[in-house]
């Protein structure tokens, strides 16, 4: 059963400017393993986190570090803990599906949550 679908797009150049202008933003949005990635990859991961938030109804008090994007042999994966895990479990999410891409200055992500 599909619990929800979320889609988000991020302007890579604008996102990069925000990271430069706000030094603590990278630390607030990303776990240590993500922080070392280039701006294009970070923009795609932020789009994925936004898509996860949309699936979950943009829960109040969501900690951005409670959702991170990993990689396995099949591609990108959604990983959750804490505040995000609690809402996902309450909504019956058992499995996440994620597709990310970037082209022409835009990063995009689509997330499907399955119950």
Curated annotation (Swiss-Prot):
GO molecular function: holo-[acyl-carrier-protein] synthase activity; magnesium ion binding
SUPFAM superfamilies assigned: 4'-phosphopantetheinyl transferase
Enzyme class: transferase
Nucleus listed as a keyword: no
InterPro entries cross-referenced by the UniProt entry: 4-PPantetheinyl_Trfase_dom (IPR008278), 4-PPantetheinyl_Trfase_dom_sf (IPR037143), ACPS (IPR002582), Ppantetheine-prot_Trfase_dom (IPR004568)
UniProt entry tagged with the keyword Metal-binding: yes
Cofactors demanded by this protein: Mg(2+)
Its EC number(s): 2.7.8.7
Binding site for Mg(2+): 8, 50
Family: Belongs to the P-Pant transferase superfamily. AcpS family.
Protein name: Holo-[acyl-carrier-protein] synthase
Designated gene of the protein: acpS
């Amino acid at each position: 059963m599909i619990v929800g679908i979320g889609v988000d797009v991020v302007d890579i150049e604008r996102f990069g400017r925000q990271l430069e202008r706000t030094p603590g933003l990278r630390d607030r949005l990303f776990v240590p393993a993500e922080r070392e990635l280039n701006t294009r990859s970070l923009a795609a991961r932020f789009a994925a986190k936004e898509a996860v938030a949309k699936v979950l109804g943009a829960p109040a008090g969501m900690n951005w570090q409670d959702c991170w994007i990993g990689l396995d042999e099949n591609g990108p994966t959604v990983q959750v803990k804490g505040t995000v895990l609690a809402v996902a479990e309450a909504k019956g999410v058992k499995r996440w599906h994620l597709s990310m891409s970037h082209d022409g200055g835009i990063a995009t992500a689509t997330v499907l949550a399955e119950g």
